[in-house]
Amino acid sequence: MGRIIRVTGPLVVADGMKGAKMYEVVRVGEMGLIGEIIRLEGDKAVIQVYEETAGIRPGEPVEGTGSSLSVELGPGLLTSMYDGIQRPLDVLRQLSGDFIARGLTAPALPRDKKWHFTPKVKVGDKVVGGDILGVVPETSIIEHKILVPPWVEGEIVEIAEEGDYTVEEVIVKVKKPDGTIEELKMYHRWPVRVKRPYKQKLPPEVPLITGQRTIDTFFSQAKGGTAAIPGPFGSGKTVTQHQLAKWSDAQVVVYIGCGERGNEMTDVLEEFPKLKDPKTGKPLMERTVLIANTSNMPVAAREASIYTGITIAEYFRDQGYDVALMADSTSRWAEALREISGRLEEMPGEEGYPAYLASKIAEFYERAGRVITLGSDERVGSVSVIGAVSPPGGDFSEPVVQNTLRVVKVFWALDADLARRRHFPAINWLRSYSLYVDAIQDWWHKNVDPEWRKMRDTAMALLQKEAELQEIVRIVGPDALPDREKAILIVTRMLREDYLQQDAFDEVDTYCPPKKQVTMMRVILNFYEKTMQAVDRGVPVDEIAKLPVREKIGRMKFEPDVEKVRALIDETNQQFEELFKKYGA
């Protein structure tokens, strides 16, 4: 028990804290606000408080809890909405109304709800950390696997029968090698700043299919990969992340709203229960965990929310699921680090950010990955991290963007000009890149189309050629270009408007399956080949531009039937044959 001697914003200094540990959770002041020790000097402790500190004064008590900031991992996580330190917001609302009173705590997992537990092991079985003890149907989509905590191993001496239990009831007793008995419940706690262990990291060879053509075809994300979405305000970072949370083929989605507008979290809460998962037809909310730490919540909790989210994601990964984690936005998290660092009077680095910004960002993204999990059955799980970055004024040379780009392998550069032109997703195809293309091309060739890489590279080269031609057009106008280059501009316009641009509000076009993506690309590249032949044979470019099939190609993104899209190849060939006859070519 210590006493407060100084309060500066979210930082509190207390003395008489002998025996306290780094990162220990403490209750601060008469109200019992939740805080975490972030520095120890002699018997003084510097505490960052996760709640508003107004009204706290020197002399009030500070009480240690003896444990570090941890999350509860067990059934009841999915469909929940938490704040940055895993307090369930719906329970807090019942306790204090629409505005959260200070010093409130509530268990993260519901204590009174009964879950139907089916055991998967029997008495006498040897178990190690990560083994599956049993399963609980948490939602209609996800079966929650009850795991042996990583630090436990031994022989099962008692196990509960199949039936309904709360998370507090003991379901298994394990006799450890030293003869002591460990009682296991359906949940365990894990410190958020410690990454959960695994057996082996695997190379990222499987793409995370998002149904967004720009991303899947050109700037692919791999399962277990890391991606950054930097962009200026209003360029569509949050909407792009919502699209990825809705349609990516991860089985579990953890969405962290970190320091962004509250209404954006409301959007997710209103939309996700109505939306259906394309694979199961069930509401998307049933596979989602939301962590809301909006801009009007205390700054210090922003820093914790990122760790809370990734720990929950790692827990589902350990069950053998593919998890996608969206962090929106890591810039606000970095700003929270900067504010706390400033209050600690640390030496500032570039633009006032702390000198350890780079290592903190790297530490977060390094927790992503595709792994063989702990346990005897060699499960494979993954955590893919997609972090939005909001640089002030859209300046990509800013420290948070630069340090993020050093660590992540995929860069989706959002462009305010494209967003203003209503081009969604506003990912600039000239500035973005993905370093996973080589690793995942085998998957595309085996499962979708053996010519995927060739078509992708051809289309990319055309888009780069268009950028060069646009500069000439701006200076001398389009009429000065030779026919061959005019024809390229026709095709690249089709690539931009009919392929890259997508309608997030259209039932069909909001999600484009891989087979359809490749077929659409084939249709456009077939048109390109025929166009080049026609120009070489002397057909005027204006005639090519007037072909009726162009309008159908423009509408193919709204066509759910892939065979009808494929039929456009024959139609294109036929119309070009007629052109060749007409011009005697």
From Swiss-Prot:
Sequence positions that bind ATP: 231-238
In terms of InterPro entries, this protein maps to:
AAA+_ATPase (IPR003593), ATP-synt_VA_C (IPR055190), ATP-synth_a_Xtn (IPR031686), ATP_synth_asu-like_sf (IPR023366), ATP_synth_asu_arc (IPR005726), ATPase_a/bsu_AS (IPR020003), ATPase_F1/V1/A1_a/bsu_N (IPR004100), ATPase_F1/V1/A1_a/bsu_N_sf (IPR036121)
Q: What is its EC number?
A: 7.1.2.2
**What's the protein's topology in the membrane?**
Peripheral membrane protein
Q: Which UniProt keywords apply?
A: ATP synthesis, ATP-binding, Cell membrane, Hydrogen ion transport, Ion transport, Membrane, Nucleotide-binding, Translocase, Transport
Q: Which residue ranges does UniProt annotate as crossing the membrane?
A: none
| Catalysed reactions listed for this entry | ATP + H2O + 4 H(+)(in) = ADP + phosphate + 5 H(+)(out)
Q: Does the keyword Zinc apply?
A: no
Q: Which Gene3D superfamilies match?
A: 2.40.30.20, 2.40.50.100, Bovine Mitochondrial F1-atpase, Atp Synthase Beta Chain, Chain D, domain 3 (1.10.1140.10), P-loop containing nucleotide triphosphate hydrolases (3.40.50.300)
Write out the function statement from the record.
Answer: Produces ATP from ADP in the presence of a proton gradient across the membrane. The archaeal alpha chain is a catalytic subunit. Component of the A-type ATP synthase that produces ATP from ADP in the presence of a proton gradient across the membrane. The A chain is the catalytic subunit.
Q: Which family does it belong to?
A: Belongs to the ATPase alpha/beta chains family.
Name by which UniProt lists this protein: A-type ATP synthase subunit A
Tell me which species this is from. Answer: Thermococcus sp. (strain KI)
The uppermost taxa in this organism's lineage are: Archaea, Methanobacteriati, Methanobacteriota, Thermococci, Thermococcales
State which gene encodes it. Answer: atpA
